[in-house]
Swiss-Prot record:
SUPFAM superfamilies xrefs: LuxS/MPP-like metallohydrolase
HAMAP family cross-referenced by the UniProt entry: LuxS
NCBIfam families given in the database record: PRK02260.1-2
Lineage: Bacteria, Pseudomonadati, Pseudomonadota, Gammaproteobacteria, Enterobacterales
Protein name: S-ribosylhomocysteine lyase
Signal peptide range: none
PANTHER family: S-RIBOSYLHOMOCYSTEINE LYASE (PTHR35799:SF1)
Alphabetical GO biological process terms: quorum sensing
Length: 171
């Protein structure tokens, strides 16, 4: 099975919160698609609670679009990582990491402004697969953690696992 790009970086050296360009590619029409790793927690040391990350998933995508879309950028998708340490954001365009970090901070400030669970978009059995598994309080705790810390940039060339280590791991 081919090794996915996300598994060629050393998770023990990742900073969090941090932005990382996980992948870039060109479409057949020449558009750039960029996938960002938005790392909320240090891998294997911290994890976002499931109710909080689920609520954040419902809020984050809209708020990020409000702050990042435009000037050659259009968010396609923002999805939580299965390991619950961050989100992947796929977009058309190639914004600088600092622009992404600034939008991320602004989106987290927006999360703190949500006053009631009833304001969470798509929070019903018709539009959400586990609509009862939410916590606005946990989502706001996650947002506050991001706002309380500087967002760094994780560089792939500093995190790439050496070929010897990949061989040792039998990959």
């Amino acid at each position: 099975m081919p090794l996915l790009d996300s598994f060629t970086v050393d998770h023990t050296r990742m900073a969090a919160p941090a932005v990382r360009v996980a992948k870039t590619m060109k479409t057949p029409h020449g558009d750039t698609i960029t996938v960002f790793d938005l790392r909320f927690c240090r891998p294997n040391l911290e994890v976002m609670p499931e109710r909080g990350i689920h609520t954040l998933e419902h809020l984050f995508a809209g708020f990020m679009r409000n702050h990042l879309n435009g000037e050659g950028v259009e968010i396609v998708d923002i999805s939580p990582m299965g390991c619950r340490t961050g989100f992947y954001m796929s977009l058309i365009g190639a914004p600088e990491e600092q622009r992404v970090a600034d939008a991320w901070k602004a989106a987290m400030a927006d999360v703190l402004k949500v006053k009631d669970q009833k304001q969470i978009p798509e929070l019903n059995e018709y539009q959400c697969g586990t609509y009862q598994m939410h916590s606005l309080t946990e989502a706001q705790d996650i947002a506050q953690h991001i706002l309380d810390n500087a967002i760094r940039v994780n560089q792939n060339d500093e995190l790439t696992l050496p070929k010897e280590k990949l061989a040792e791991l039998h990959i």
